[in-house]
Curated annotation (Swiss-Prot):
GO terms for biological process: chaperone cofactor-dependent protein refolding; protein refolding. It comes from Dictyostelium discoideum (Social amoeba). The gene is hspB. Belongs to the heat shock protein 70 family. Residues 625-634 have a biased composition (Polar residues). Its main location: cytoplasm. The keyword Electron transport does not apply. Residues 609-640 are annotated as: Disordered. This is Heat shock cognate 70 kDa protein 1.
Amino acid sequence: MSSIGIDLGTTYSCVGVWQNDRVEIIANDQGNRTTPSYVAFTDTERLIGDAAKNQVAMNPTNTVFDAKRLIGRKFSDKEVQSDMKHWPFKVIPKDGDKPHIQVEFKGETKVFSPEEISSMVLLKMKETAEAYLGKTINNAVITVPAYFNDSQRQATKDAGTISKLNVQRIINEPTAAAIAYGLEKKGSGEKNILIFDLGGGTFDVSLLTIEDGVFEVKATAGDTHLGGEDFDNRLVSHFVDEFKRKHKKDIMGNQRAVRRLRTACERAKRTLSSSAQASIEIDSLFEGIDFYTSITRARFEELCADLFRGCLDPVEKVLKDSKLDKKSIHEIVLVGGSTRIPKVQQLLQEFFNGKELNKSINPDEAVAYGAAVQAAILSNEGGAKVADLLLLDVAPLSMGLETAGGVMTTLIPRNTTIPCKKTQTFSTYSDNQPGVLIQVYEGERAMTKDNNLLGKFELSGIPPAPRGVPQVEVTFDVDANGILNVSAEDKSTGNKQKITITNDKGRLSKEEIEKMVADAEKFKQQDEQQKDRVESKNKLENYAFTVKNSIKDEKVAAKISDSDKSTIESETESVLKWLESNQTAEKDEYEDKMKALEAVVNPIMSKLYQEGGMPQGGGMPGGMSNDSPKSSNNKVDELD
């Protein structure tokens, strides 16, 4: 069974598969090897990827992106609250404190969870792979930032389930990138590799050792909330201020203007990676005012100076955590599109005392590449080339439970290699205590109130005894996906309780996932129907125009009687008029119109053929013979 590797990115996603003894990164239907993580909803259809991103300025409130910045988070998170200020689409709390996205779709208000939006992007990646491989794909390895916590990982897995993918493994993005790097560089002793991954929305630094195909993550740090979009935001704010200064007008209230400016800023940022200056030219940006301006690389670097410098903090942290100094790093590998920014490269190189950075792997594709290798290993497909690779990943955050006085007692410290299992014995706090409440947290702070509650459960039925006598054995078990199971057992009675950390944190229940899978299937069918509808419409339109033009051909005009000519003219004219006012008719309406038009046209055309009035091979669609008007359906997809 083929399995694919998917890099589900904040701004762009990428898919790869192991084939012919190597990884192939698969281009989408637009020929692009990365696909925007965008989903758009219009009056007539749902668009995913390039098509969604290309119409964002016309439809900002119903075009959803950055779902990765919402997935597995709470609505009240301060990051979510601050992001919402930048998003043109509407985010609302639902089911307690879960963020959901509200859009208008086919004239109705719809509400989607971040998992559902991400599942639509995953579906697009799945379909891209299926179109290339010519078969159905069910299995995938999906990557997440190393710093994603338990709920963000679980929610990503749920998104896979909704898109009908069996998620074989969730792996960390920097680990995947290290595989991409390591596969190219096998052998040659133990190496310490620093992976510096700065993408569109997240930033990860990981330190790994690679030796004889064993990848061991020593430490990981980062910011789930720093990336190319934050640099875009700085540019947007800069130009909004400039527009205010020049024209005394604030464009912030106009979403379309802001969106057009953001697109121009993203383009300028990319230009500045290779040029010292970039110009921005936007016609009629706001209230008819053209906005022509430029920005230098130096100015851009100044606008983002604190963000760029901040990229070094996690680098220092992983060195400290893995107890290594800068000199003992053998390779610094750049991953993520934002590592193309010269200033970022310069700061990193200076930090490592001028050491050359490794740019041998494609920063946009490395993560999907590594995920595809891992997918091949898990489905026993990669053969000898990958068989001896072993991935030892780590838990990004400490996990433990609350003990008396709200103290965090850690069972699994962060950067512990996973999968792993730890057991510790606890007791009661007061005499004759009938039960204990096991509250599971993740985080690095001393008090649980400052950490993140993962879930809780009660172990009851403890026989009366003085405090400190009962023995409750608590086991933390982290699987290879970084997902935690906790169990507690009262040693005197053998009474046992356990919890898989899933739903307590605004996670999706099994029922919700099943409902979302069904919804996803429904949307997919609607997408198919929409495609069929558009094809029938285009077919009718092409046919009408071809017929209309064919009677203007001199040879035909000479042979055709005036009455036949006017019949054809009036029929095609009325069909074209009807088409103008019925752009959203159903497929069978278009087909009926087609049949009716053919019924009028065919007898006239076959009469011409018999009289030899038709030019050979091509006056009519496909050089029609009298019984095959349908040869007009050699389909050419037209672009609007």
